[in-house]
């Protein structure tokens, strides 16, 4: 008995000591900016390690399942036995379908990605769900589906960062920054491009550049890139050889033209993905079998693609002979079409992954094809297919993924040629403007739109959703029966005793607001004993719902031209649950906006 008591006391002491150390760490990371920067670096190391491990696992799967040589990329157009090309995606689809069906039984909520987490939930993500997404991405890509691993990199990195930040109980904005650090580390490790990883976090995951986020995100991206360099012998996933490519001022209009055309291709790819999802959703088969059906289609497309993948990757087609150049251009056009279809089918049937890698590949093909066609029609222009491949690659990724400056830095870091920057910057801007004007969404925000979410970026709109009327309203409001006499009302509610009184009917439902200035008007003194309150009510049809956010409430106040409105539970029962004044709603709204401004400027560390 004494031994058990001693063990119990010891375990309590250990637990108490751990709690004290955790509390101390929480204070340090909340109070010290340098400590938070180091925390971001730790997140970058973890994300870079996860991305490197995932990349190696997928590479091993390619070597084992498709029978390619060690260190050879499956996307390099190497010869693969035809039966492997057909059967591996089908088998992979069956395995993925079984995994998704099994995980769905234990998952009670929808998976939240880093963009949605930062936009709505203040950076909160589930680590188990994120690891599940990473596993599904590896199964999809490893079995030959035309999807990118970047979705898995950012999901796993963001999930680990969110879990760590939640354990340390960091502030809402700091948690959003940590999720951005996880994404930055993963992308930087994948492409060995720390600047691209950092701006991926700024533009796509955090939703904007801020002083407070600069140091932790950049340190995280650098840490992820260093980890990948130490653990991986492979080059970047899409190596494109460029060397000191000159800038041609006389071809500037052609650069803008290829950017606009590439943006149109990117829009078509996104629409094709949506159409594919709808077609697979309409199939009368189990969702677990749809990846296998899509895998069969992808295998057939891959079989045709590999017959002409070598000439497609020959981006110097314009330097070939006339007949050879035509064959190269035809091969590039065929691969462009088949790769687009394969990506649309892969995502539509349920394979897990993104369009980042596909957008880079398709963009490079589009640029090389454009340069080859122009050189064939106008030999005197002598466009460099490699330069136009890089330009179009950046434009396509800016259209599909978003984040124009992410793609500028990615292209520069992948090629090592800063002379391309003056051409890439205007091209990605043209592509982004074209996509915004003609389509209005990136691939991620387009999927949010189809789901009914009003998310256009990772900007934090969750605080608006959390600041609801139910949280702002006052519940101790006075009520009166609508059939009461004015004289009784004046007796029960003397002038100055209340700011407003809500009238309800015999069933307790909202009837209107009694304006006190009207109830105590001098012209009603003689008729007070015979006048009922129903004749004096205002705002009979203007009410607030407890589920409204503060922005919707302010808009309702403006439309009703009211200083205060009653809050009802729903529009059917109309039972009064509280009252809210416009002045208080505006004060809280402005207070939250000021808090967001302070976080953006990094002032929260010193407050």
Question: Which residues make up each language-model segment?
Answer:
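Alpha-helical transmembrane segments and immediately membrane-proximal extracytoplasmic
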Residues: 1-466, 470, 475-489, 498-501, ...
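Hydrophobic, well-ordered secondary-structure elements that form the walls
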Residues: 353, 402, 430, 472, ...
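The conserved cystathionine-beta-synthase
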Residues: 480-498, 504-505, 521-526, 530, ...
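Bateman (tandem CBS) regulatory domains
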Residues: 454, 464-477, 484-485, 515-518, ...
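Flexible loop/coil segments at beta-strand boundaries within sensory signal-transduction domains
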Residues: 506-509, 571-575
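Juxtadomain coupling helices with adjacent low-complexity linkers
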Residues: 582-607
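Short hydrophobic beta-strand motif reused across regulatory alpha/beta modules
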Residues: 409, 511-519, 577-585
């Amino acid at each position: 008995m004494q031994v058990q008591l001693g063990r119990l006391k010891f375990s309590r002491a250990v637990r108490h000591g751990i709690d004290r150390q955790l509390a101390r760490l929480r204070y340090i990371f909340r109070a010290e900016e340098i400590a938070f920067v180091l925390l971001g670096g730790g997140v970058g190391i973890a994300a870079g390690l996860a991305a490197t491990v995932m990349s190696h696992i997928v590479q091993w799967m390619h070597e084992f399942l498709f029978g390619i040589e060690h260190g050879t990329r499956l996307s390099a157009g190497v010869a693969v036995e035809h039966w492997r090309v057909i059967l591996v995606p089908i088998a992979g689809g069956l395995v993925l379908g079984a995994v998704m069906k099994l995980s769905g039984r234990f998952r009670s909520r929808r998976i939240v990605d880093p963009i949605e987490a930062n936009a709505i939930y203040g950076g909160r993500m589930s680590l188990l769900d994120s690891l599940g997404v990473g596993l599904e991405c590896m199964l999809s890509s490893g079995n030959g589906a035309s999807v990118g691993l970047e979705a898995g990199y950012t999901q796993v990195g963001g999930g680990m960062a969110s879990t760590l930040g939640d354990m340390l109980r960091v502030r809402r904005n700091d948690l959003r920054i940590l999720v951005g650090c996880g994404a930055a580390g993963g992308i930087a490790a994948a492409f060995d491009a720390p600047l691209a990883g950092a701006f991926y976090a700024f533009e796509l995951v955090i939703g904007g550049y801020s002083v407070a986020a600069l140091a932790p995100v950049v340190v995280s991206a650098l840490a992820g890139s260093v980890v990948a360099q130490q653990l991986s012998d492979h080059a970047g996933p899409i190596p494109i050889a460029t060397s000191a490519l000159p800038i041609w001022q006389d071809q500037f209009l052609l650069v803008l033209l290829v950017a606009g055309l590439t943006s149109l291709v990117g829009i078509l790819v996104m629409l094709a993905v949506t159409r594919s999802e709808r077609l697979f959703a309409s199939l009368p088969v189990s969702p677990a079998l749809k990846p296998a059906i899509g895998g069969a289609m992808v295998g057939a497309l891959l079989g045709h693609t590999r017959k002409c993948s070598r000439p497609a990757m020959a981006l110097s087609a314009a330097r070939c002979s006339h007949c050879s150049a035509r064959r190269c251009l035809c091969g590039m056009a065929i691969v462009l079409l088949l790769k687009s279809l394969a990506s649309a089918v892969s995502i539509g049937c349920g394979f897990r992954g993104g369009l980042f890698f596909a957008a880079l590949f398709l963009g490079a093909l589009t640029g090389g094809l454009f340069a080859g066609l122009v050189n064939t029609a106008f030999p005197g222009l002598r466009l460099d297919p490699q330069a136009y491949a890089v330009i179009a690659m950046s434009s396509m990724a800016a259209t599909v993924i978003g984040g124009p400056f992410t793609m500028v830095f990615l292209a520069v870091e992948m090629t090592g040629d800063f002379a391309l920057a003056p051409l890439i910057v205007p091209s990605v801007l043209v592509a982004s403007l074209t996509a915004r004007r003609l389509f209005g969404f990136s691939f991620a925000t387009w999927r949010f739109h189809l789901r009914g979410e009003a998310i256009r970026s990772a900007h934090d709109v969750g605080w608006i959703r959390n600041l609801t009327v139910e949280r702002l309203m006052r519940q101790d409001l006075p009520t009166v029966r609508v059939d009461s006499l004015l004289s009784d009302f004046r007796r029960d509610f003397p002038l100055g005793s209340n700011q407003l009184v809500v009238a309800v009917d015999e069933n307790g439902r909202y009837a209107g607001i009694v304006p006190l200035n009207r109830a105590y008007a001098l012209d009603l003194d003689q008729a007070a004993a015979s006048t009922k309150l129903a004749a004096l009510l205002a705002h009979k049809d203007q009410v607030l719902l407890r589920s409204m956010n503060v922005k919707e409430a302010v808009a309702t106040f403006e439309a009703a031209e009211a200083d205060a409105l009653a809050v009802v539970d729903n529009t059917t029962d109309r039972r009064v649950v509280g009252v809210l004044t416009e002045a208080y709603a505006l004060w809280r709204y402005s207070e939250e906006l000021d808090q967001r401004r302070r976080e953006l400027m990094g002032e929260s560390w010193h407050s």
